[in-house]
């Protein structure tokens, strides 16, 4: 669309505003309760209703947060029947706050929000299922405003989704991310079976020369062996007006995450190669782009 703007009696300028450019915002999953890192938004987990988070907040702590940053809440647990009362009470309380969105895995979250007519935006976050725009559009038409895109599809597929949906996209861009989740306490069962004792919060699995962090809390989670580093792809996502990218600070020290955040905020085509190398050095050269440039092929061994 062309708009004429009259500057004075003799000059007319023509502006093409057919495409509006938005800023791609940075969401951080923090590994501490102090929200003192300069990002656009935080994704916070709530005790007993979230999984795969480095740190968990109580509802009262959420209520007392004083920040100008956007706050997303993760209620991404696969809920049990005995979770539903707490879940409903929590959603009611969260609907009274200035929450940007609720990440959910269990469809029960959506059902409760619709049944109670709660005014709270939702984020479809069924990690390994958010792979195509047709399903994303289905949930968008059900009232789900955002989608956390799977880490298991290529950059071009993410961009294709963006071109074919009205859903606001949140794309994982850096950090360790969950690769496998089990309701069973696999580490605890292993220790019990062999009469071993280990009070470590985080353990590691060695497999074919790679090391995978494993956390056994309310569920057992195995994380990727390397950090996802998508800073190069981030520039392309910005060009495509993708609304958010997600950084997970799990096992990254505060000083390092600050350096990385600053690079994401100042990256350009001119410094991208330098920044990519710097992030690799910061993360001990243990980085990968995973499926961003690989076809999604699963092999059973």
Which residue stretches match the model-derived regions?
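Short, positively charged and aromatic/hydrophobic N-terminal segments
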Residues: 4-9, 15-19
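Generic N-terminal initiation segments characterized by hydrophobic and/or small/turn-forming residues
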Residues: 9-10, 40
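Active-site pocket-lining/capping segments in soluble small-molecule metabolic enzymes
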Residues: 20-135, 148-301
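As written
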Residues: 143-144
């Amino acid at each position: 669309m062309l708009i004429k703007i009259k500057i004075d009696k003799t000059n007319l300028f023509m502006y093409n505003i057919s495409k509006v450019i938005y800023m791609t915002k940075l969401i951080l999953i923090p590994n501490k309760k102090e929200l003192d890192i300069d990002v656009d938004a935080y994704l916070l987990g709530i005790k007993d209703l979230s999984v795969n988070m480095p740190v968990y907040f109580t509802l009262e702590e959420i209520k007392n947060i004083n920040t100008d940053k956007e706050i997303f809440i993760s209620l991404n647990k696969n809920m049990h029947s005995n979770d539903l009362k707490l879940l409903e009470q929590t959603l009611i309380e969260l609907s009274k706050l200035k929450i940007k969105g609720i990440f959910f895995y269990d469809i029960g979250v959506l059902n409760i929000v619709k049944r109670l007519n709660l005014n709270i935006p939702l984020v479809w976050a069924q990690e390994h299922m958010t792979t195509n725009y047709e399903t994303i559009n289905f949930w968008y038409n059900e009232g789900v405003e955002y989608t956390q895109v799977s880490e298991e599809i290529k950059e071009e597929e993410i961009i294709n989704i963006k071109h074919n949906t009205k859903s606001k996209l949140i794309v994982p861009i850096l950090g360790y991310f969950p690769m496998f989740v089990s309701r069973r306490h696999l580490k605890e069962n292993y220790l019990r079976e062999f009469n071993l004792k280990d009070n470590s919060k985080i353990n590691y699995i060695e497999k074919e020369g790679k090391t995978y962090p494993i956390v056994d809390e309310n569920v057992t989670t195995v994380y990727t062996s390397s950090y996802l580093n998508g800073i190069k792809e981030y520039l392309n996502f910005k060009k495509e007006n993708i609304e958010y990218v997600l950084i997970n600070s799990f096992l990254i020290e505060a000083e390092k995450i600050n350096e990385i955040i600053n690079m994401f905020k100042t990256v350009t085509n001119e410094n991208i190669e330098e920044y990519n190398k710097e992030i690799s050095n910061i993360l001990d050269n243990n980085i990968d782009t995973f499926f961003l440039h690989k076809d999604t092929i699963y092999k059973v061994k």
